[in-house]
Amino acid sequence: MELEKVKINSLHCNDAVLSSLQASPSATSPQSVPSKANVVTEASIIEKTNQPHNVQEDNNYNRDCDSPESSSSEQDKELDDLRNLHSSSLTNSVVVGKSTGSLNGVYSITSVTSETKTLESVVTTNSASGSACLSNTPTADHIKKRIPSSRTPTRKALRIKFYRNGDRFYPGITIPVSNERYRSFERLFEDLTRLLEENVKIPGAVRTIYNLCGKKITSLDELEDGQSYVCSCNNENFKKVEYNTGSQPLSNLPLSNSRSNSHRLAKCRPSSPLKNGLLAGSSPFPACGGGTGNGSPLIASRLSDRVTVVHPRIVTLIRSGTKPRRIMRLLLNKRNSPSFDHVLTAITQVVRLDTGYVRKVFTLSGIPVVRLSDFFGSDDVFFAYGTERINTAEDFKLEAEEQRAINVIRKTMRTTGTTCKGPKPKMPIKSKKVYPPLVDSEPFKAETTPEDDRHAALLTSTGMEINELPSNIRNTYSLGRIIGDGNFAIVFKIKHRQTGHSYALKIIDKNKCKGKEHYIDAEVRVMKKLNHPHIISLILSVDQNTNMYLVLEYVSGGDLFDAITQVTRFSENQSRIMIRHLGAAMTYLHSMGIVHRDIKPENLLVKLDEHGNVLELKLADFGLACEVNDLLYAVCGTPTYVAPEILLEVGYGLKIDVWAAGIILYILLCGFPPFVAPDNQQEPLFDAIISGIYEFPDPYWSDIGDGVRDLIANMLQADPDVRFTSEDILDHSWTIGNKGNECTTYKR
């Protein structure tokens, strides 16, 4: 048994249609139909419509219908015929009313006999003329049509345009936004991050959306169709600039919800060390199957040019004006230099011309700079002009004072070697407490001493009792030797009783850090957020009244300070491996807005092979780490590795970690730090650090290449504004070179 569906949208039918209806199985006598089957479900939907597209849709359904003009009397007669026809065959009648020119869509579902024929007649009404027709085809089996349901209307997605925060040249990207497509704000953030990474360099994931007036958007319901918004990454504040609202967006994504649209959210994206710890030497644009995602050849070409041309470098800028002119420096990298216009904007923000934007740039020899690659060639000094007139005879000549200023800048970036006078500088002394011989010389002694007695002896040597250990740690792990110590904590090697895996147990004495408890809380809070192959993992944390216990990942090779004291200096290949791993860890931290503040060899753990070569480096000890929401002013760190802005107390941020990494790279290659003072006196040391002037003395640097010297010079810039970022370290040509991670022997 089937259901016969009749949809009546009009009140005008011809004789052929009426004959078809009378000959249909529904005319069977009621006695031949089982009583339970004599059920008629009637659904009448009457709605007024004046929308042109609805009329057009109805006309498409009835393009084969005969639609002559009919009078009111003819319609009345046809209505009576239809009533008589249905009343003779249905247990419940179908109500059919007189057309008023606005009747649209009357459904009738009638139970019939077991004959398997289905009739679906679609009739439309033209609301303007009051005339329509009943669709008819030769056989009922061939007139099945899908009836759209008005109960589940398709919601139209909002068409929203998004800009990159502070980027006045980025033309924006337009995407459809709806509650069906994005169930949460975080999902929209993920898609915006992926789309922006394909077109511009961004410092991290999209975290905030603003309107063009700077108001923060907190829900999808606040977005308006056809409006523009600004995407902010990490903790960036809204930058009120003249966004490129009149330009054509880079990518206008279709509004279709079809999953077959492979171009909607292309997953072809640069591999980034921020999230997966990959080395910078890996291919930044992996091939994507199925074509270029979201992609025009113009965008792909632009990204390719940026990758091949742009590299981190510091340029010197001479501001146009009255002589002697102001001399400034600017760090160019992939974030602020994706195009020629972006570089002009960056220069404008630094030189601050009285005439406004920088319009023209010249080299020191007076050659106009017209391409992006010109900023990354052999010239590193440029004149910046606005709309003012240029006197080529005088403007490109440097006065003595201007030349001296440029020479001072170049001196701070010196990469040539000088002869070292006097004895070779030494590494600073590693602070370490002295414990009884039981701990240092005979760490385990399990054969002669019961385990509990050995644990008690180890803890007693540090002023602790065996019962002070938390039960879940005492029952799960076997205590080993002391492997590290600091001002507030001590670190034991422990072993899991069931698996035999080694871990490190850090015990922080709260009594020794009175008033600094927030550092302990910050360390645990930060480490719980981290997951990176070159950062020590936190396995378990237990907080008690007197101590904080942290079970950490164990690295077998010890810390980098001990490795340096054993081998004195490392080869460039070994140093490259370590700086890659350290740079990847810092980039990951900085992308989350976290600064370590105590990067030094004692806090870098290394894994060695059987020949003593470094295979892996991991960053540890987050006791001073914190999240950066604004400039920090607390003076902390280790004197040898402290950055100038910390000593000057002018406020500092993420780049103090880059300075410390530059000191470490210098030490790896020659065995001593760039800034030293006699007898380890702090005042002369701090003066040297603030000056930012150091040398690459021979013979210790005679066999070391210019590439790594250039990297060190950029990492040890006293001015944090022009100092390399952690990403710039990974992008440098020396760091990218020899990607194979091949191990070579130490330099003895």
From Swiss-Prot:
Compositionally skewed regions (Polar residues) per UniProt: 22-35, 47-59
Task: Kindly provide the name given to this protein in its UniProt entry.
Answer: Serine/threonine-protein kinase CG17528
* KW Phosphoprotein (keyword) present: yes
Give the Enzyme Commission number.
2.7.11.1
Carrying Phosphothreonine, the residues are: 91, 100
Per its record, the protein catalyses: L-seryl-[protein] + ATP = O-phospho-L-seryl-[protein] + ADP + H(+); L-threonyl-[protein] + ATP = O-phospho-L-threonyl-[protein] + ADP + H(+)
Q: Which CDD domains match?
A: DCX1
List the GO biological process terms: intracellular signal transduction
A Gene Ontology cellular component where this protein is annotated is: cytoplasm
The family assignment reads: Belongs to the protein kinase superfamily. CAMK Ser/Thr protein kinase family. CaMK subfamily.
